[in-house]
Amino acid sequence: MRKGEVVDEKGAPLRADSPCRIGGYIFYYRELEQETPIPFEERVLYRDDHILAVDKPHFLPVMPSGRFLRETLLVRLKKKFGFEHLVPIHRIDRETAGVVIFSHNPDSRGDYASLFQKREVSKVYEALAPTLPDGRFPMTYRSCLAEGEPFFRMKEVDSEPNSETRIDVIENRRDTTLYRLTPVTGRKHQIRVHLAALKIPIINDRLYPDLQRRGADDFSLPLKLLARAISFPDPLTGQDRCFQSGREL
C-alpha cells in the first residue's frame, strides 16, 4: 500500500485506513513472471488539464486484472505521462477497440464522472457481423439482460427490458454488414448479446452466442467491435466535446 500498488476499481490508490464499500473492488499491482506483450499501440486523441481521450487497440485491457498488469491501458498511460491520479471515467471490454476517456485531475473528476451518471454522454459503436436477412433499418432492440454462466457472460431473460440498442447499417460488404450501434443503456456486453440474439453475432466473438474454448490470443482475429465515438457537453466549459477513433474494422 505504501507504494500505491493497491487501488480501487477506478485506479485510485488505497490506504490502510481507506473505507470499504459494499460491492466495491480492490486491485493490487503485482509482479507477473510472464506477461504476453500486446503488439498494438494506443493513440492519444486529446489532452488538457483535466482529461485524456485515448484510442485503445483491440486486446488491451483498460485496467489491470487477471493475467494483465503492465500490458494495460492505464499502466501504459501512467508510464508515458507520469500522471499519479489517472483514472478511467468509463471502460470498454478488452476485446473492443476505440475511445476511452480518462481523468487525471481529482478536482474535476466528479464533474466528468457525473456526466455518465446523468446519461449525458452519447456513444456510437461500429460492428462487423453477418447480414440480417430481410432486416429493416434503422431498428431498436430491447431485452432484459442478467448475469449468465460463467459469471463473466450475460444472458437474456424473460422480464421487463433493461437494455436498449439502436441499430443501423453503414454499408453492406460481400458476406457481412458494417453496423452502427447506439446503446441507449449501458449494460455489460449489451451490444454483443443483442447482435447474437438477432442471429448476427459479431465476427470473431469468442463469448457469444457460444462460449469458445479459451486459448492464447490470436492477434490476427480481433473482435470486430469498435467504440467509434463518444460525445458530451464539457461540464467545465459548456463546450460540446466529440472524440472519434481513427481505427477501422
Regions found by a protein language model. Give the residues of each.
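RNA pseudouridine synthases
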Residues: M1-L249
